[in-house]
Amino acid sequence: MNQLEKYKELLLKWNKTHNLVSKSQARNLDEHIEDSLSVSDLLGPEVLDLGSGGGFPGIALAIKNPTKKFYLVESNEKKSAFLLNTSNQLELKNVKVYNKRIEELLPERFPNNLEIITRAFGSAAKTIKSSEHFL
């Protein structure tokens, strides 16, 4: 079983108790993975995924880009536990999970060339306001 298939299996298993994705998202995981991977060629070497939730786009991108480093930020403890467990199960050495709000993170602890991505975190205004200390 490849890593993306294993990721989908873990996501569906954990979703039963952790509400990681909606029922409609669970039925269309391939579509959400494909959507997440659509930015793959545009990313630099260091990426912060804001509001990682069930791992879209961070986990999917980390699987397809093993030479890039991904910092997954998720304030929900259950979702963070899923992200940490999944990155360990998939042996994703390029993933670091932070169970914090973005406002709590110190930019100086991250690379200067860090790129920020997000999917369903909130409006553009909310995303910019929450992460402005990284910009």
Language model region names:
Residues 44-53:
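Conserved class I S-adenosyl-L-methionine
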Residues 19-20, 55, 120:
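Residue-level preference for alpha-helix termini and adjacent loops
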Residues 67-71, 75-135:
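S-adenosylmethionine
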Residues 35, 49, 74:
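Acidic active-site catalytic centers that drive phospho-/nucleotidyl reactions
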Residues 2-45, 78-95:
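Class I SAM-dependent transferase core
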